[in-house]
Curated annotation (Swiss-Prot):
Substrate binds at S142. Its EC number is 1.3.1.56. InterPro entries: BphB-like_SDR, BphB_TodD, NAD(P)-bd_dom_sf, Sc_DH/Rdtase_CS, SDR_fam. The lineage of its organism: Bacteria, Bacillati, Actinomycetota, Actinomycetes, Mycobacteriales. NCBIfam families: BphB_TodD (TIGR03325), PRK06200.1 (NF004849). CDD domains: BphB-like_SDR_c (cd05348). Pathway: Xenobiotic degradation; biphenyl degradation; 2-hydroxy-2,4-pentadienoate and benzoate from biphenyl: step 2/4. Pfam families: adh_short (PF00106). One of its GO terms (molecular function) is cis-2,3-dihydrobiphenyl-2,3-diol dehydrogenase activity. Belongs to the short-chain dehydrogenases/reductases (SDR) family. It comes from Rhodococcus globerulus. This is Cis-2,3-dihydrobiphenyl-2,3-diol dehydrogenase. The active site is at Y155 (proton acceptor). Has a 50-fold preference for NAD over NADP. Keywords: Aromatic hydrocarbons catabolism, NAD, Oxidoreductase.
Length: 280
């Protein structure tokens, strides 16, 4: 187990990628504190993992929720080694022209208070504990932190902001605390919800046929599941393997950034080459 006796805090840990991270970290020997708004989801975590999990109901938009979670984490487990900012919402690729003028302020504030301020507040609350443990921070970014069309103007702008935060916080907090990010693409099993301000709060990404949409776009030829993406988080959370690693964002998106203009990949060339028996 690669995270034996490590203590981790995950925001948005009750569903989708967040739940997959919690499950994987517990399996790797970690003890995990979770901050989430879902009472039912928190109860499911307690039932699944027992004393390995501390579950706190709260809202990432408020510093007090983060402070309460950090305090309960340290009180229960004695320390905090890694903070994972993961809670977020999506705009379902709503273009600026599609956002009504009378909803733009509300939609902007909702997006940035959750997807940007929520991360910053979490780190602020965890600073003392992470300094004491010489710990680390991991942010869930997105392919939208690097490229257009992974969301609309609100989501893409927010994720670009997180890339900047990774770099700035790595500078400000080093050498005591490492700060890195992981930028997944679309994930199977994701429960990412939309903006309430755009009437998308009850829409779940799990209902969108992303797999069919992405299979011909990604160089890998398939969309990753949430569970398949957790290995990157384990890697960044380990101490022995990542001593010099800070200020980095790992593209974990199926190769979106290397697809060609007209084809997602040219693996057909290998198929043709080997089918002719050129190499065995």
């Amino acid at each position: 187990m690669r995270l034996q006796d490590e203590v981790v805090l995950v925001t948005g840990g009750c569903a989708g990628l967040g739940r997959a991270i919690v499950d994987r970290f517990v399996c790797e020997g970690a003890r995990v504190a979770v901050l989430d708004r879902s009472v039912a989801g928190l109860e499911e975590l307690r039932a699944a993992h027992g004393d390995a999990v501390v579950a706190v109901e709260g809202d990432v938009r408020y510093l007090d929720s983060h402070k309460e979670t950090v305090a309960k984490c340290v009180e229960t487990f004695g320390k905090l080694d890694c903070y994972i900012g993961n809670a977020g919402v999506w705009d379902y690729s709503t273009a600026l022209v599609e956002i009504p003028e009378d909803r733009l302020d509300e939609a902007f504030d909702e997006m940035y208070s959750i997807n940007v301020k929520g991360y910053l507040l979490g780190v602020k609350a965890a600073l003392g504990a992470l300094y004491a443990s010489r710990g680390s921070v991991i942010f869930t970014v997105s392919n939208a932190g690097f490229y257009p069309a992974g969301g609309g103007a609100l989501y893409t702008g927010a994720k670009h902001a997180i890339v900047g935060m990774v770099k700035q916080l790595a500078y400000e907090l080093g050498p005591h605390i490492r700060v890195n990010g992981i930028a997944p693409g679309g994930l199977g099993g994701s429960d990412l919800r939309g903006l309430k301000a755009l009437d998308l709060a009850e829409v779940s990404l799990s209902k969108v046929p992303l797999g069919d949409m992405l299979k011909d776009i990604l160089p890998t030829g398939q969309m990753a599941s949430a569970e398949e993406s957790t290995g990157a988080y384990v890697f960044f959370a380990t101490r022995s393997e990542t001593v010099p690693l800070t200020g980095s964002v790992l593209n974990y998106d199926g190769g979106i950034g290397v697809r060609g203009m007209s084809e997602a990949n040219r693996g057909d060339l290998l198929d043709q080459f080997y089918s002719k028996g050129a190499l065995v």
